[in-house]
């Protein structure tokens, strides 16, 4: 079990995600489903992701955020804003190239009247493996350094999914 959690809320069509604790791949399936559901809505005006409460974020969840950035760009919607005031997380975001595809700020008022947790889902075998693969491919697509950094991880997932 992960001690991380992702809370969500919205304000005037802007979806807000608040990451807390150690955000690991155990949350990725639920987060991806939530994001896919939200991105199908016609009234979405943007996304803000508050990372100030996160202790750590694994590469799978970073990859899901990269997919979100790409989806917003394809839909001609505003760039996703990441809020991060932690040097370690800021260094990680820059290392994977998020400064090129996200608006990263140290502070922003994200007070919401109502928030709810995105509950984790049980692993669904191949579906989870495919999501892990897609998330890491999204990271690889950001820059050459990521292509090198995640090549072996992607290859391992591809091998696992071969019939």
Where do the language-model regions lie?
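STAS-like cytosolic regulatory interaction modules
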Residues: 1-53, 70-163
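Residues immediately C-terminal
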Residues: 56
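Histidine-anchored nucleotide/phosphate-binding helix
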Residues: 65-69
């Amino acid at each position: 079990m992960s001690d991380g959690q992702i809370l969500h809320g919205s304000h005037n069509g802007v979806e807000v995600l608040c990451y807390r604790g150690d955000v690991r791949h155990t949350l990725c399936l639920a987060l991806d489903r939530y994001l896919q559901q939200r991105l199908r809505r016609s009234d979405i005006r943007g996304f803000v992701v508050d990372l100030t409460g996160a202790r750590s974020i694994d590469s799978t969840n970073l990859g899901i955020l990269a997919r979100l950035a790409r989806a917003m760009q394809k839909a001609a919607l505003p760039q996703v804003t990441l809020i991060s005031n932690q040097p370690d997380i800021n260094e990680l975001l820059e290392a994977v190239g998020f400064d090129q595809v996200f608006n990263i700020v140290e502070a922003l008022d994200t007070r919401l009247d109502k928030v709810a947790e995105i509950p984790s889902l049980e692993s669904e075998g191949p579906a989870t493996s495919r999501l892990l693969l897609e998330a890491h491919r999204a990271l690889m697509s950001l820059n050459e350094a990521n292509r090198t950094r995640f090549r072996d991880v992607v290859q391992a997932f591809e091998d696992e999914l071969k019939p």
